[in-house]
Amino acid sequence: MTNSIQISCSKTNLKTIRDFVTQYLSQYELSEIVLNQIVLAVDEIAANLIIHANKEDASKFLELEISRHDKQLLFEISDHGISFQRTNYKEPDIEEHIRIGKKGGVGIAIVNRIMDKVEFLTEGDRNICRLYKTVF
């Protein structure tokens, strides 16, 4: 089964990412909740890269590679856009966002809650986000 995909940085390609992750995960007997959480986390990172790092520039690309390491799945999403500076990130109060009806700004916080480990790296001009999830 193919375990990598490359898409142009257009929001219309987010469905392609979600479908690809769902198809890949279908080989494993995951609960529907876990499957949907993983798809949500990968979709959120891909959306952030498309919108914020690459300014929805369809001439730019991001790549997703999925691999299994023992009991853990690794989702590696890479691009050549503006790198995410985790040191500048302040986790929002999700309950407060809900209470006041604020939209947006909680994606990374949700990803942090869903995945076991989240890493942001830069190697040369390539930015990499690694999402780890133990499911086996």
Give, region by region, the residue ranges found by the protein language model:
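Helix-loop-beta hinge of the Bergerat
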Residues: T2-E32
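Conserved short strand/loop->alpha-helix "switch" segment adjacent to the catalytic nucleotide/phosphoryl-transfer site
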Residues: V21-D43, I100-K102
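Flexible, glycine-/charge-rich segments associated with ATP-binding catalytic modules
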Residues: M1-I5, N112-F136
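Short helix-loop "hinge" at the ATP-lid/N-box region of the Bergerat-fold HATPase_c
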Residues: L49-N54
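Conserved polar catalytic motif of the HATPase_c/GHKL fold
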Residues: E44, N48, R113
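Short beta-strand/loop element within the Bergerat-fold HATPase_c
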Residues: F61-K71
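Glycine-rich phosphate-binding loop
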Residues: I100-M115
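Glycine-rich/acidic phosphate-handling loop/turn and adjacent ATP-lid/helix
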Residues: F75-K103
